[in-house]
Amino acid sequence: KVKLVSYVVSTAYGLKPGANVKVEINGQQYEAAATGDGQYDAFVKALRFIYRKYLDRTFPLLQNYAVSIPPGGRTDALVQTVITWNDNGKILRTRGLDADQTEAAIKATFKMLNIYENENTNEL
């Protein structure tokens, strides 16, 4: 139910990292931009804005973020990102795998969002 339509994340020396994000949630498209302390932080801030402004809902709290690269990994090694989320006391752990660390985190985030949307749809 939650699809990533497009995104751009940027980082530049001397400038704050930013993200432009377009997502589709339950068939409706939303777009937002944000800056943050890093690319992923900016990405999540844009998603939080969408959930708050357009959906009038909370966004689960990121509780822990762990990145692992296999021993002996090179610059093109797969990165595993495991993110622990807290949704009003309910703990959820999702994993993303990609050669790019930010993309791995984004994959883990969208796994969480689809679980979150499925649970919220069932409650209605």
Language model feature labels by segment:
Residues 1-124:
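Terminal or standalone catalytic/regulatory effector modules within metabolic enzymes
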